[in-house]
Amino acid sequence: MGLCNTNLTLSAAQATPEAVEYTEILEAEDRPWVTVVWDDPVNLMHYVTYIFQKLFGYSKAKATELMLQVHNEGKAVVSSGSRDKMEHDVRRLHAAGLWATMQRDD
């Protein structure tokens, strides 16, 4: 009986790290993707505001807020969602001449 109890204890101890790793993977998969627009020396602030309104449907106030964040902080998150949608958003921003990347949300 002592051997059975020892084996059960070892099995339980070995299962714990796998459960933690699996949980970490699930949490990483649950994090949405985001599109980040970066400051650049080319585009005018008015144009960036216009693009945010046109591509994402933001109000002038929200688009201006995001544009100022890009201008003052160097970047701003302009959209979030699935990886496919963020890839699409990045392509549209590139087509408009803006610098944009995508990443997992923090």
From Swiss-Prot:
Coiled coil: none annotated. Gene3D superfamilies: 3.30.1390.10. Pfam families: ClpS. Transmembrane segments: none annotated. GO terms for biological process: protein catabolic process; proteolysis. Binds to the N-terminal domain of the chaperone ClpA. Involved in the modulation of the specificity of the ClpAP-mediated ATP-dependent protein degradation. Belongs to the ClpS family. This is ATP-dependent Clp protease adapter protein ClpS. It comes from Nocardia farcinica (strain IFM 10152). The gene is clpS.
